Amino acid sequence: MSAAGRPVVVTGASSGIGRATALAFAALGHPIVLGARRVERCEETAQEIRRAGGTASSVALDLRETDSIVAFAEAAVAALGRVDVLVSCAGDVLPETVVGTPPEDFAAQVQINLLGAQHLVSLIAPQMIERREGDLVLVTSDVVRSPRPTMASYVSSKWGLEGLARALQMELEGTGVRASIVRPGPTLTGMGMEWPAEVLGPVLDEWKRWGLVRHAGYLSAEAVAQAVVTVATQPPGTHLTLVEVEPEAPVRPPREPS
């Protein structure tokens, strides 16, 4: 499944990992549909791809709205003819706790990070199953392995997304359609980084208290995108079910001889 030209849909493509993933696939010759709420940002990236000789279009996608998800799926298929690769990168994170967060706010995060992804997969996957070929790549987070306080809805929904992916892997076995998880560690994107200092500072202090900050290294969005591409371009007969990507610790200077 490594041949160039497989039509690819990327959600959350307005910035960060999603944008980097769209650019990485486009550089290999794949036609792309980019989706996100900030569709104008997606269109800027689509124009960049087209200027480089690629094929790309942007479509508005709001994972909070059922009608938007359905319209996006229909538009993506219309633009590409078919979808061979669906990459679910869309996500949102707010500094929320279990106790004290209004249920409707908690539910909104779960809708974006989990339920919206399930809806889109349910619309795209049947065509893949019928053709006996396709890749569904779900980008989760290392919070599944190392939950963080003050991110309760994000942790819950990413755990759910991995559970969905695992169930999907069993459902799809023998169909020629692969469902895969890419689980990145801390990544230098806008998500969470734009929190005000008075919010981010106490959050980081809490993570340190729980031993969740080992070093100051961060992944680039491009590094995670390469992992996504690697997963989706494996040859038939090979299935990377879970790929974890973590930042390497900054290299320390050698110790002076005592």
PLM features: residue spans?
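Conserved glycine-rich Rossmann-like NAD(P)H-binding loop of the short-chain dehydrogenase/reductase
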Residues: H30-E44
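The beta1-alpha1 cofactor-binding region of Rossmann-like NAD(H)/NADP(H)-dependent oxidoreductases
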Residues: V39, A60-A71, P103
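C-terminal helical subdomain
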Residues: I181, G201-P254
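Substrate-binding pocket helix/loop in short-chain dehydrogenase/reductase
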Residues: T97-V98, P102-V110
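Conserved glycine-rich cofactor-binding loop
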Residues: S14-S15
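Active-site helix of classical SDR
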Residues: V121, S157
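Residue(s) in the substrate-gating loop at a strand-loop-helix junction
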Residues: S141
